[in-house]
Each structure stands twice: as C-alpha cells, then as structure tokens.
UniProtKB/Swiss-Prot annotation:
InterPro entries: Restrct_endonuc_II_NlaIV. It holds the Pfam family RE_NgoBV. It comes from Neisseria lactamica. GO terms for biological process: DNA restriction-modification system. The keyword Hydrolase applies. This is Type II restriction enzyme NlaIV. Disulfide bonds: none annotated. Keywords: Endonuclease, Hydrolase, Nuclease, Restriction system. Its EC number is 3.1.21.4. It catalyses: Endonucleolytic cleavage of DNA to give specific double-stranded fragments with terminal 5'-phosphates. The lineage of its organism: Bacteria, Pseudomonadati, Pseudomonadota, Betaproteobacteria, Neisseriales.
Amino acid sequence: MIKLTAQQIFDKLLDEEKILSANGQIRFFLGDVDIIVKQKDVVGNIIQEWLGGWLRKREIEFDVSTNTQMPPDFFLNKKDRSRELLEVKAFNRNASPGFDIADFKMYSDEIIHKPYMLDVDYLIFGYDMDDNGNVTIKDLWLKKVWQITRSMDGWAINLQVKKGVVHKIRPGVWYSINKKNMPMFECLEDFVSAIEETVYQNPATRHNASLWKRKFEEAYKKHYNRSISIPRWHEIAHKYKKK
C-alpha cells in the first residue's frame, strides 16, 4: 500500500487516469435483468463509491469514515486521523452545485472540538450524464471548505433554511466568472467568522454564541500550537456582498 496526499490523488486522477476523458456507465443487475441506469440523481453517490474502489485497486492507503453525517469520507493517514482528510462531492455540471457541506449545528459543534476538520480537502467531480446513461467527468476540483462557500442574503453563510429552521451548509458557485455573484470566502478566518455569526443568528444555536469564538480559538491553539485570530463578522461582511 502507498500513502498519497489529497493533492497527489487529484494529480493522479488528472494526469495518469485522464479522468476528464474517461467514459462510464452505471449498470444494475437483478436476476436475469441488466440495465443501464439513466437517473442523474444517483451519480454522485456512485462516484464516491467508485473512488473508494479506485483507491483499493491502485493500492492507495485509506480508511472509510463511519460517520456519514460529517466530513470526511476518507482518512488518507490511518495512523493520524487529524491529517489528510478527504471528502468527495459530485454534482451535475449542467446545473449549480446541489450537494450539502454538512449539517450546520453538527458542524459548528464539531469544529470547536476538532478544528482540524476545517482542513478537510474536498475532491469535487462535475459530471454529465447523457440520455443513454453515459457518464463523463467535465471538471475536477480540489478545494478547502472556505473556497467553496459564501454568504447569502440575511445570513452570514449560505444555508438551507426551511420554515425558518436552519439545516445544511450549502456551497456557492466557486467556478463562476459572474462578478455579480456573491464571492467565496477569502480565507479560513473569514469562513469561521461567518460560522460564529450564524451560531448567533440561528435560534437553535444562539445559546452557544457568547463563548463559541473563544472555545474555537482555544481548541485551534491547543491542536496546532499556534494562535488564530477570528475577526467579527461586522468587520468583514462588506467583502462578501453582491457587487
């Protein structure tokens, strides 16, 4: 087995596997019936499973996370599960990214105990499926969470909100060249600032707001042995409005 970083896996998929010129199909067998799956909504989960199969076949070391509610999907360092964390996402490249980053409440609780969760690498497949069920990968990205998230009207971070209840953190369109779109966060510190502000904005988490920032900074210093300074959202909010 060989150890690879997320960056090395990304490079290998592009340069050796030529993933952007590969073709595939999703086939399903049951009894004596064999079909080609043509429903696009299953492709994302299949790609994640495919990557696990690819890692095994290429004899790349990894463990699968048992927590399906939170990143990462894969641990690339079996001995240190606070490093080399890989999350796989996929979306229909002909539409905007429709995947979830994480449940907001769980995520905001998690990172004040495990600040290294902010260092997860997101390997993102932009796929296409034609009418015959042929699947191709149109784009592949390797990003950190703050590079694929943004603010939204009324909230410091882009969220799925149903009937006033906050559910999931949602991505922005990080590859857009439309300058009128809300920009992605510029750095880890600004992303964490948006999380803190949302902890306060969200009625379900507001009781944690007064101590949240301090707890995060203390946990970060304990883990990394260096300090981090998180700005208040009102100091940086102007950077993340629509142009």
